[in-house]
Amino acid sequence: MEFWFTEKQTERFGITMKIKRTLHTEKTDFQQLDMVETEEFGNMLLLDGMVMTTEKDEFVYHEMVTHVPLFTHPNPKHVLVVGGGDGGAIREILKHPSVEKATLVDIDGKVIEYSKTYLPTIACALEDERVDVKVADGFMHIAQSANEYDVIMVDSTEPVGPAAKLFERGFYEGISKALKEDGIFVAQTDNPWFHQELVSNVYKDVKEIFPITRLYTANIPTYPSGMWTFTIGSKKHDPLAVEATRFHDVQTKYYTPDIHRAAFVLPKFVQDLLK
């Protein structure tokens, strides 16, 4: 008997994948967690029935949420990841030699635990001595931080359940306070096909807080529509004004200096969402 998984991404649209086997399933204190092995995308993490990451295409998301802000900042030393319990963002952050400390704050320790077990190529850097892993509420962690981080990345789930407050204006105001005077933050902000209001509202909220605010995109096959947005807010450094000499060699599969620049070239319908 064949086993197929379908993520219903809207009421009329979804993505379906053939499953080899279920690796782990558990109702944590915060969400339904499933690890499955797929035929096409390798091992896959699902939270509340939604695809979070897969072994085959994870590099796109993790490279784009990290390298864009890290190359924009001239000397990032202390970096915070809110969410991101799979460890992929941490893996990419540590490719930057200037980084002295990377802090990861995820509310659900089970995501961290089972990512280490079933997604070892993604979670491979979580034991690095430069990494401080905290199982805690990212919203509260931000509220208790001030002038501490060079770069903050919000690697959250969809805006439902415990992650909903990570898409609110008050959270972005807290991030601004938690950043140093030339700090940068980036958040994944869903897709512009099915969640246009979210993309628009987050961008406008961030723009009212950060003097430099931009939106960029990446192509991620297993995410809704395959087109994903990231909103970046910066106090001083413009991601479109990065000097060519700042780009150093990092081992990537998607991100390049050309991709860095091209990601900010938006289709007209996405530009219109930001007006």
Curated annotation (Swiss-Prot):
UniProt xrefs under InterPro entries: PABS, PABS_CS, SAM-dependent_MTases_sf, Spermi_synthase, Spermidine_synt_N, Spermidine_synt_N_sf
At the top of the EC hierarchy, this enzyme's class is: transferase
Q: Name the principal localization, coarsely classed.
A: cytoplasm
Molecular-function GO terms, alphabetical = spermidine synthase activity
Which catalysed reactions does the entry list for this protein?
S-adenosyl 3-(methylsulfanyl)propylamine + putrescine = S-methyl-5'-thioadenosine + spermidine + H(+)
EC code(s) of this entry: 2.5.1.16
Residues in PABS domain copies: 2-235
Cite a single GO BP annotation.
spermidine biosynthetic process
Cell location: Cytoplasm
Annotated pathway, please? Amine and polyamine biosynthesis; spermidine biosynthesis; spermidine from putrescine: step 1/1
Q: What does this gene product do?
A: Catalyzes the irreversible transfer of a propylamine group from the amino donor S-adenosylmethioninamine (decarboxy-AdoMet) to putrescine (1,4-diaminobutane) to yield spermidine.
Q: What is this protein called?
A: Polyamine aminopropyltransferase
